[in-house]
Amino acid sequence: MPSFKNIFKVVGQDGPAHAAQSGDVMERIRHDVQGNKVLLYMKGTPEFPQCGFSAAVVEVLNGLGVPYESRNVLEDPELRQAIKEFSNWPTIPQVYINGKLIGGADIVTEMNQRGELAALVK
């Protein structure tokens, strides 16, 4: 009869393939963040946000008239987890401007109200 230690070892033995796949997602995130002036990781799409926080960020960005790219984390569970690890930020949405994490809905809304966000996206 296998011990728990052995069972866990067997269950986790798919690690290298998963690690390679995770590395691919991290590379895709890195490429997207560096390659887009304004990038939004969100639940849903700008046309159909799937949470109130994502909708709030879309409203702010659209209100500024700034072009931005978005990624729907609901379409890709691996992306949804990887973006949180990439940024060390636990929630979605996440807004990146000029390759740097700005924050989520509360921070973006507050920066917009103070006029700071418009200066960053120009």
Predicted regions and their residues:
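Structured beta-strand/turn binding interfaces of compact recognition modules in eukaryotic regulators
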Residues: 41-43, 76, 98
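Non-globular targeting/processing and membrane-anchoring segments
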Residues: 1-36, 43, 47-64, 74, ...
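A short, hydrophobic beta-strand/beta-hairpin element that forms part of a small beta-sheet core
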Residues: 91-107
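Residue-level detector of anion-binding/catalytic polar loops
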Residues: 67
